[in-house]
A protein has these predicted regions:
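A general structural signal for well-ordered alpha-helical segments in protein cores
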Residues: 6, 58, 180-184
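A conserved beta-strand/loop capping segment in the N-terminal third of enzymes
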Residues: 1-3, 32-37
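Active-site substrate-recognition segment that forms the wall
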Residues: 79-81, 85-87, 96-193
């Protein structure tokens, strides 16, 4: 099983000071009573933590950036060039902007930005899949990893989020419905309620 296969990794983490407790099937049921009683054992990251609202964290970081004098502009960047005064010229769909320093968060779309200070990077997309189960966050007390299935299920403010499968598919590929169906079927099997 995957727990046996992960023993080297678990030992490495423990050797690095990560507190991990081995737990039995009974202990899993005590910690997470809504899980189907099919797990022979597992591990618990004793000091583990998670966000229940990742969007709120990003909003707070953005606000902190603005409070420190930054400017947040949501626009499509087309070009980025050096100017003779040492500033950067950012060409967008609606206008050109000038700044000493910029942060452009374009992810895989970065390859579509032209300009003299753009280094070509062979970047492709890693598309992640997740399924949300609204109003079901109460079913888990903490994130639960399902190593055999390659998924994590996390309780968030707006429901349970199950994620873990990815693919290299490019920017224009259509979503793979089989991956979404797989995630949903695994979650329904381990959380039958």
């Amino acid at each position: 099983n995957s727990l046996s296969a992960a023993q080297d990794d678990i030992k490495r983490r423990r050797d690095q000071g990560v507190p991990i407790t081995d737990i039995t099937s009974r202990e899993i049921q005590e910690l997470e009573p809504h899980l189907a009683p099919t797990f022979p054992g597992g591990i618990l990251f004793d000091d583990g933590f998670h966000l229940t609202n990742p969007k709120a964290l990003i909003q707070r970081l953005t606000q902190s950036f603005i409070d420190d004098g930054g400017q947040f502009i949501h626009n499509k960047v087309c070009s980025l060039n050096n100017m003779s005064n040492g500033h950067l010229k950012v060409g967008t769909h609606t206008n050109d902007l000038e700044a000493k320093r910029v942060i452009i968060a374009a992810g895989a779309w970065s390859t579509q930005i032209s300009g003299g200070c753009i280094d070509p990077v062979p970047l492709d997309t890693e598309r992640g899949y997740h399924v949300m189960f609204p109003n079901d966050a109460r079913l888990l007390n903490r994130p639960v990893g399902l190593a055999d299935a390659g998924l994590y299920i996390s309780p968030l403010d707006d429901g349970l989020r199950a994620a873990g499968t990815v693919e290299l598919a490019g920017l224009r590929a259509r979503p793979n419905q089989r991956r979404l169906n797989y995630i949903e079927s695994v979650v329904r099997r381990v959380l039958p309620e």
